[in-house]
Amino acid sequence: IYVVPDNYLVKQVVDEAKRLGISVTEDRDDYNYSNSKAILVTSIQTVVNGYSYFGMRESGNYPIGSIIIDDVHACMDKIMCQFMIKINAETDAYKELIALFSSSLKDYNPKSYIDIVEMKDCRKNMLVPYWEWQRQHDNIYRILKKYNNSDNKEIYFGLPLIERGLETCDCIITASAIEISPKGIDLEKISSLEEASRRIYMSATLADDSVCLFLR
């Protein structure tokens, strides 16, 4: 599998490969790919998401033999976004989470609460205290599960990736969104990626060794 940061680059790689006479496909069900006669070119979001065909299904996950991740720094940024749930302020999920935390946030930091929730100041942000997040863990999960459907894609694709560590996640509230993100990235959930026999990372520079550790 050849993985790139976005769908525009998928098209670019496919066009160049065909020009060079290399057999490639964008279809994971392609016969030639299934029989190791063609390289699957896809985006990192296709590999890493809450319903990935490469490890998040109960059965029938697509195995990965060798995987090349091109522009690993950009792909790492995309992976971090995949593991974050961003809930827009216009949604009912946002309103219910604000209502859940309202009383404690007023007591914890009344000025920030007024700026963000009442005055809608987009320049401000507020971290939900970890003790309040853990105390409300079950109620948070109920709200996220309530809106865990294809109409709420951020929750739909993100929750399966972080639900196991939801209790220790950070939650940042702004006037425009709520962002829920884990302390670390658990790529073991993408089992086929974890079990790939060979992983190759490509970048113009790999000065930051943590990138390799992050994707090991």
Where are each of the predicted segments found?
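Conserved Walker A/P-loop ATP-binding site and its immediately adjacent core
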Residues: 1-24, 46-49, 208-211
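Hydrophobic positions in the central parallel beta-sheet of the AAA+
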Residues: 2, 40-42, 67
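Short, glycine/charged-enriched secondary-structure capping and boundary segments
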Residues: 15-19, 54-57, 81-84, 214-216
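Short acidic low-complexity segments
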Residues: 26-36
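Conserved catalytic network of the ASCE P-loop NTPase/AAA+ motor domain
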Residues: 32-34, 57-61, 191-194
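Conserved two-lobed SF2 helicase motor
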Residues: 35-52
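Phosphate-binding/switch loop-helix module in NTP-utilizing enzymes
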Residues: 49, 54-65
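Conserved coupling segment at the C-terminus of the helicase ATP-binding
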Residues: 63-66, 71-216
